[in-house]
Amino acid sequence: MQNISIVLVEPQGPINVGSVCRCMMNFGVSDLRLVNPCDDYRSLESRRMALKAERILNQAAVFQDLRGALADCHLAFGTTRRFGKYREDFLTPEQSAVQALSQPPDSTVAFVFGREDRGLHTCELDLCQAFVTIPTDSDYPSMNLSHAVALFLYELRKG
């Protein structure tokens, strides 16, 4: 799992950032990349949610744009709940984990998560080689950011 990166695009709240760090620590992933995060992403709130995963929070790399965050990645999975342009061929989280784990150990694989309120833009999904969606109920399809990250990390871990 050392070659797995979690990329959060413009996370809006420190609580979600801290919660993602905790999930990452639970599943043995340490490479967190933040694209234009909220100013207070390292706040006391975030640290409380991270609990014993402050190391991940402190070592998170910050980028101005997604292109920079993915510059060294060999494969990027863009997560989305929306169906539209360029989004016909979706993988499930389980299928994406199988593909990610089949990559050479020296290649970096990124899982890209969008904004809490509107997800990834089409131009950001264009930077990803595959699209993944979580099959949720149509009445309330949008998941909390840290919960979505946890689901993907679980699929990777059970590999």
Task: Enumerate the language-model features and the residues they cover.
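Post-transcriptional modification and biogenesis factors for structured RNAs
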Residues: 1-159
